[in-house]
């Protein structure tokens, strides 16, 4: 599901909200999460998962054009760890669909909403 598809699914699910408001809400949430991670904060969404930063160590890489070895510097990268409820929900949905779980027939937004309703 892309960001545009998420916005469209939310707008369809909540017709009382203007599409531009849904678009603004999703973009604002993603911007806030990006800013929090960029400032080194950890984000925890109970029942869904957590976002944090992981440190990648410097390493020796290879320039694909010249074959020359180059030093690739260390860097911070975002990391997502799914929460227990999300893992269980995904496993449950995957088992219900059998081998056809990649056909896109399920409604991912509905799955998230159902998971949230379990609280």
UniProtKB/Swiss-Prot annotation:
Q: Which organism is it from?
A: Bordetella parapertussis (strain 12822 / ATCC BAA-587 / NCTC 13253)
Assembly, per entry: Heterodimer of an alpha and a beta chain.
GO cellular-component terms in the record? chromosome; cytosol
Give a yes or no for keyword DNA-binding in this entry.
yes
Pfam short name (any one):
Bac_DNA_binding
What job does this protein perform? This protein is one of the two subunits of integration host factor, a specific DNA-binding protein that functions in genetic recombination as well as in transcriptional and translational control.
Q: What is this protein called?
A: Integration host factor subunit beta
> Any idea which UniProt keywords this protein has?
DNA recombination, DNA-binding, Transcription, Transcription regulation, Translation regulation
- Kindly give the SUPFAM superfamilies that the UniProt entry links to this protein: IHF-like DNA-binding proteins
Q: What family does this belong to?
A: Belongs to the bacterial histone-like protein family.
Which residue intervals make up region (Disordered)?
Answer: 91-119
UniProt feature, compositional bias: Low complexity: 94-107
């Amino acid at each position: 599901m892309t960001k545009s598809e998420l916005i469209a699914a939310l707008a369809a699910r909540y017709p009382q909200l203007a599409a531009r408001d849904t678009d603004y809400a999703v973009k604002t949430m993603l911007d806030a999460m990006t800013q929090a991670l960029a400032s080194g904060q950890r984000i925890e969404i109970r029942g869904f998962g957590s976002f944090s930063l992981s440190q990648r160590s410097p390493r020796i890489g290879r320039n694909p054009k010249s074959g020359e070895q180059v030093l690739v510097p260390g860097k911070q990268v975002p990391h997502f760890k799914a929460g227990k409820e999300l893992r269980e929900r995904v496993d449950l949905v995957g088992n219900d669909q059998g081998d056809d779980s990649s056909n896109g027939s399920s409604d991912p937004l509905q799955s998230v909403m159902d998971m949230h309703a379990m609280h």
